[in-house]
Design a protein with these regions (language model features):
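Ampiphathic alpha-helical segments that act as solvent-exposed interaction surfaces
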Residues: 15-19, 67-94
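Acidic, low-complexity, intrinsically disordered interaction modules
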Residues: 28-80
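Negatively charged, low-complexity tracts enriched in Asp/Glu with abundant Ser/Thr
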Residues: 1-44
Length: 94
């Protein structure tokens, strides 16, 4: 699991919303985002990254108490997934 702290719940919520919007847009031709599902009551969303039929990875993202949590549903995630997840966060912080 990846845990990222941003100092305040408001900052964490902004990063969460940025990542959520990034995942919803499915902007990249190299892979597709499928099965996007948001749970507003729990400040969470789940999505799947599909590179091709053999490489499909699902993630759950949520925030609480100033911490953004990113949890893969499988233990064996790939570097590209981490880059995808951290890109909008890094862009926001620049």
């Amino acid at each position: 699991m990846i845990k990222l702290g941003f100092g305040s719940d408001k900052e964490t919520q902004n990063v969460y919303n940025s990542l959520k919007n990034f995942a919803k847009k499915d902007m990249f031709s190299e892979y597709s985002i499928t099965d996007f599902e948001e749970n507003k009551d729990r400040n969470s969303f789940r999505f799947t990254i599909a590179y091709d039929e053999d490489y499909v990875y699902s993630y759950m993202v949520w925030y609480e108490a100033g911490i953004l949590n990113i949890e893969p549903e499988k233990e064996d995630y790939v570097t590209e997934d981490i880059a995808f997840i951290l890109y909008p966060i890094a862009e926001m912080l620049l």
